[in-house]
Amino acid sequence: MRLLGLLIAACVTISSTARAEDIVWSKVDDAMGRSAAVTQDVHRYGFPRTDLSVTLDGVTIKPSLALGGWVAFKPMGSQAMVMGDLVLLETEINPVMAKLIEGGLDITAIHNHLLRASPATFYMHVGGHGDPAKMAAVIHDALRSARLR
């Protein structure tokens, strides 16, 4: 009888456990407003700051060199973990941070890579765990609040 109980419990656990394949990545793409670059099971979205003209000691910085923001999702069961690094101007930090925190995401760092750059750019590290489409919508909304796409 005990063996039968364990077998039933194992079957219920296996049948109710959602897998990474259950995540509908097209919904995440739609929420992000772009398609991901996919490597194995990691879905990465780039946000290069091509709208900025940043100089450092008279040298123009190319977005691909130091102005490439991104977020990446990795499936964890039926949910996902998200991590990223967003490139922001000083005036964009508070509105983006407020939206991300309001949406349940974590800000793990804000720092500067390019001292003496003009305009000053800052790098906001974000992270979270949960429904990937919901987290993507929060990130997209936060970036839109700073007029970033």
Model-based region annotation:
Residues 20-121, 125-149:
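Long, contiguous binding/interaction regions
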Residues 5-15:
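Bacterial N-terminal signal peptides
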